[in-house]
């Protein structure tokens, strides 16, 4: 079982999901009175976890859309670039890294940057290209 933020009838709903069975249960159906978003769910999880048991057959995932877990973070997201050797080497060879040194697998110090909360998107969502600011995008980001 997993927790996910699903779009159901144009509304974001925090759900318990069984991806193998293709079913979900809205947390609000399992925990009467819960009406929050994923941030509230995470904050209240210690009090909710004993009540989070799938009941019945669940609802089919067909017709739902997986959203970003937290669609509107409260502040900028701090990121670390080139944080493992394979990615650092790949990025250095790509020609997009003006700071790369010959044979460098990872920098001596972390590459830290932020992304505005407004840049969060869900799986499969289109990535705005902003052609006025750049002609190429890095293909990867992860939490």
Model-identified regions with their sequence ranges:
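N-terminal non-catalytic cap/leader segment that marks the start of a structured domain
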Residues: 1-110
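Non-heme Fe(II) oxygenase catalytic core, chiefly the N-lobe of the double-stranded beta-helix
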Residues: 115-143
